[in-house]
Amino acid sequence: MAENTPKPAAGTAPAKPKPAAPGAAKPAAPKAARPGAAKPAAKPAAPRAAAPSGVYKKPPVDRPDPNPFKDSKRDAVAGWFQERFYVLNPIIDYLKHKEVPKHALSFWYYFGGLGLFFFVIQILTGLLLLQYYKPTETDAFASFLFIQGEVPFGWLLRQIHAWSANLMIMMLFIHMFSTFFMKSYRKPRELMWVSGFVLLLLSLGFGFTGYLLPWNELAFFATQVGTEVPKVAPGGAFLVEILRGGPEVGGETLTRMFSLHVVLLPGLVMLVLAAHLTLVQILGTSAPIGYKEAGLIKGYDKFFPTFLAKDGIGWLIGFALLIYLAVMFPWEIGVKANPLSPAPLGIKPEWYFWAQFQLLKDFKFEGGELLAIILFTIGGVVWLLVPFIDRQASEEKKSPIFTIFGILVLAFLLINTYRVYAEYSMLK
């Protein structure tokens, strides 16, 4: 059927489309391309403006917020500190999630904190005593008399310092043996044991160097006897001369003991203590072997604030005991040291050296002192390396041989300490 639309004649140009009338509707937009149809080519990106010749333009860097905790809800004071010390927030959060196991032997954990508490008391009272003490042969004893009689509450300050030193060492011994018998030194806590034992040795060094500072008769002759012992060992005479500042105990010895007591030893203790506490926080507190498998763990205390609050209660009890001992059982000043006078009866070191002192007395035969020093050295090295030797404990197995070894060491210390106490009590 023929169409009615006329075709253009051959040779004639096609008719141009008529322009749309004003107000007429615009032609409809082209429909979206069907799926699979070829997409039109993307327009090329506009070229970046060239930087001035010879000038490097640093590209922008997306930096994280330096303080992600600044918008957290805290009171004004806490928020102020949090905004300035925000790097400590992860540490605080870690301590909040740290837990300590609860069981029948958990109370032994608190003796380490008591030792730290008495060490802080030592620092505070020592700094106050340092304001009046004069470390010279002529003025040392007189300065103690001045502190005792003229300084307001000076007598109490001196007694607190003396008693806190003894209580600190006692707490450290208890902490060490409780750690040993619970096998808390086992893997991965070997370095906690090593650093703790080094802290005990440094604390004994505090006791030895501080004993001479009052410059009284007992302290003078006890130091003379104590510094004689290393002479029998190879190189011991040279070491003793350095410690004494000369061939005999004198004013130079007092000065050197003072510098060791207030400068060198505190610095070493702070370094080792920081390492020890860091390891304790990282590795945590271990329960005795087999307690977890036997269901003897009663639960867990949050280190902060639960365990720390219980620690604080122990500190308050320890402080009350310290004040009671300082007031009711004061340490005597004694008589000023006279190097030319004969040694009085009853010369002995402090109680924490009595076991070694008794062994030296028992080994009075030729070469006995050297043998005693060798035994002390070997015993100390073995005690230090127990975590690395006791492989059964590292495998969470009981090690009765090391338990017996610890009982023998404890018995040696207690029996010989009592022997010295009994002997010298009869001389009074």
Swiss-Prot record:
Binding site for heme b b562: H161, H261
Membrane topology of this protein: Multi-pass membrane protein
GO cellular component term of the entry, any: plasma membrane
GO BP: respiratory electron transport chain
Residues annotated as transmembrane: 110-130, 162-182, 193-213, 260-280, 312-331, 369-389, 401-421
Subcellular location: Cell inner membrane
Composition bias, Low complexity: 1-15, 21-52
Record: residues binding heme b b566: H175, H276
GO molecular function terms noted in the UniProt entry: electron transfer activity; metal ion binding; oxidoreductase activity
Keywords, sorted A to Z: Cell inner membrane, Cell membrane, Electron transport, Heme, Iron, Membrane, Metal-binding, Respiratory chain, Transmembrane, Transmembrane helix, Transport
Cofactor: heme b
SUPFAM superfamilies: a domain/subunit of cytochrome bc1 complex (Ubiquinol-cytochrome c reductase) (SSF81648), Transmembrane di-heme cytochromes (SSF81342)
Record InterPro entries: Cyt_b/b6_C, Cyt_b/b6_C_sf, Cyt_b/b6_N, Cytb/b6-like_sf, Di-haem_cyt_TM
Comp. bias (Basic and acidic residues): 59-72
Cofactor note: Binds 2 heme b groups non-covalently.
Chain intervals for the UniProt region annotation (Disordered): 1-72
Remaining remarks: Heme 1 (or BL or b562) is low-potential and absorbs at about 562 nm, and heme 2 (or BH or b566) is high-potential and absorbs at about 566 nm.
Homology family: Belongs to the cytochrome b family.
Protein name: Cytochrome bc complex cytochrome b subunit
Lineage of producing organism: Bacteria, Pseudomonadati, Chlorobiota, Chlorobiia, Chlorobiales
